[in-house]
Amino acid sequence: MPFSNSHNTLKLRFPAEDEFPDLSGHNNHMAKVLTPELYAELRAKSTPSGFTVDDVIQTGVDNPGHPYIMTVGCVAGDEESYDVFKELFDPIIEDRHGGYKPTDEHKTDLNPDNLQGGDDLDPNYVLSSRVRTGRSIRGFCLPPHCSRGERRAIEKLAVEALSSLDGDLAGRYYALKSMTEAEQQQLIDDHFLFDKPVSPLLLASGMARDWPDARGIWHNDNKTFLVWINEEDHLRVISMQKGGNMKEVFTRFCNGLTQIETLFKSKNYEFMWNPHLGYILTCPSNLGTGLRAGVHIKLPHLGKHEKFPEVLKRLRLQKRGTGGVDTAAVGGVFDVSNADRLGFSEVELVQMVVDGVKLLIEMEQRLEQGQAIDDLMPAQK
């Protein structure tokens, strides 16, 4: 849990080596970077809101690793964390985001007209398409560190802004604490709502404090545009629908996001953003675009093929299980999405998914007919 700074001062009575965590059995990005020397250098520092290096790393100390993915092992508590603790965050960001340097500049492109194709992914294979991102509101602490009052203020601001959306984006807000157990579970099963805070990453970082206070979901009337409020990020914006029309999903995503930003600006609030890291979010893995464009895709043959992991790697894609990050694939259905977030624009990332998914379908069709796929192996993107 985030501590007050008087507690941090108390800890400074012990030498740094006595406070250094045991990372000997760990496999996450933080554990690769954090040395006793770096810990000693950073441990007396804190951000203006009181977030310390111990708060940054706690989730990675408590969660040594993950069987499916290399976790990051740290979080930011506020916008300043990435600057105050940059000696820790910069190498983690470089490691996680394919060599992204502290001097690199991020690019943003939320113009759906720049996406080539994407309206014709075969619905016999692509069951659903989804694009999501996160946004943080400048001037508030991030979920690992925010107070109840901050969280409630974020909810109020967000609901006011979202209630101004109209046309096919018009919808309503559902506060988590006023939902029945059955309503919650139905939304979770339909992939509309974030899970209950059982994830050790959420729990250890302090993001689940006061649950379900000031958490909720806003969605439009046909449930194709959703905003999660106060889960891992202040806002998670999601556009989704059945079938393979990624172009339509991305267009709705860009339009909705642009309108939300305009509504916040009209109330004199802006999103956390800087030219180097792009949009600032709680987890360093989401910096930049924060964007994950994914499809649920049926690949019963390719999914079992020994080359499948290599194909995904070359296409800069990653797979998750059917139910998300902590789950296995059911019935040969995979959640396939872009592996990158930072250093590429939104349009570039969605383009990689569209082009990559087309190739995956072509490979699956070859394997259905008992043919080889060696000649279809892509070059490394």
From Swiss-Prot:
Keyword annotations from UniProtKB, A to Z:
ATP-binding, Cell membrane, Cytoplasm, Isopeptide bond, Kinase, Membrane, Mitochondrion, Nitration, Nucleotide-binding, Phosphoprotein, Transferase, Ubl conjugation
Q: Which GO terms describe its cellular component?
A: cytosol; extracellular space; mitochondrion; plasma membrane
- Glycyl lysine isopeptide (Lys-Gly) (interchain with G-Cter in ubiquitin) crosslink, residue number(s): 45, 101, 107, 381
Top-level EC class as recorded in UniProt = transferase
3'-nitrotyrosine modification sites are 269
Q: Which residues form the Phosphagen kinase N-terminal domain?
A: 11-98
User: Which Gene Ontology terms cover its molecular function?
Assistant: ATP binding; creatine kinase activity
Magnesium found in the keyword field: no
Phosphagen kinase C-terminal domain mapped to chain residues: 125-367
Cell compartments where the protein resides: Cytoplasm, Cytosol; Mitochondrion; Cell membrane
**Region Disordered, residue ranges:** 96-122
Residues engaged in binding ATP: 128-132, 191, 236, 292, 320-325, 335
Phosphothreonine occurs at which residues? Answer: 35, 322
Sites bearing Phosphotyrosine, chain numbering: 125
Q: How is it modified after translation?
A: Ubiquitinated by the ECS(ASB9) complex, leading to its degradation by the proteasome.
- Residues modified as Phosphoserine: 4, 199
Per the UniProt entry, the Enzyme Commission number(s) are 2.7.3.2
Q: Please give the function described in this protein's UniProt entry.
A: Reversibly catalyzes the transfer of phosphate between ATP and various phosphogens (e.g. creatine phosphate). Creatine kinase isoenzymes play a central role in energy transduction in tissues with large, fluctuating energy demands, such as skeletal muscle, heart, brain and spermatozoa. Acts as a key regulator of adaptive thermogenesis as part of the futile creatine cycle: localizes to the mitochondria of thermogenic fat cells and acts by mediating phosphorylation of creatine to initiate a futile cycle of creatine phosphorylation and dephosphorylation.
Entry note about domains: The internal MTS-like signal (iMTS-L) mediates targeting to mitochondria thermogenic fat cells.
Q: What is the name listed in the Swiss-Prot or TrEMBL entry for this protein? A: Creatine kinase B-type
| Source organism (scientific name) | Bos taurus (Bovine)
Q: Which taxonomic lineage is given here?
A: Eukaryota, Metazoa, Chordata, Craniata, Vertebrata
Q: Which gene encodes it?
A: CKB
